[in-house]
């Protein structure tokens, strides 16, 4: 799954990366704490590492994907790859909170 960073909220020990993807697009982490590897779409050179919590824009405590420490520095509008979302991504997706289902390209 490819998603875009819409906002980065600075925190005390970690920053919150708000993505345009949400729990309605990928329900597995919210449903049963499934882990999906998160990667930047572009690797940056340098040693600048940060701690991030990757979350969706829905105001739900379960709308979160992962917490990663020592991730490369990110900026708003960067693209993020969420790996191994599987064949059941679309069937588990919903229109929760009046959000459209994700676009699926085969």
Language-model regions, residue ranges each:
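Charged (often Lys/Glu-rich) extended helix/loop segments that serve as interaction or gating elements
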Residues: 1-106
């Amino acid at each position: 799954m490819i998603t875009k960073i819409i906002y980065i909220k600075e925190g005390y020990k970690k920053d919150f990366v708000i993505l345009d993807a949400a729990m309605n697009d990928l329900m597995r982490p919210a449903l049963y704490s499934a882990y999906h590897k998160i990667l930047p779409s572009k690797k940056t050179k340098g040693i600048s590492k940060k701690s991030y919590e990757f979350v969706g824009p829905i105001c739900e405590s379960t709308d979160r994907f992962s917490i990663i420490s020592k991730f490369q520095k990110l900026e708003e509008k960067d693209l993020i790859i969420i790996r191994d979302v599987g064949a059941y991504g679309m069937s588990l997706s919903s229109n929760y909170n009046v959000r459209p289902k994700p676009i699926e390209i085969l």
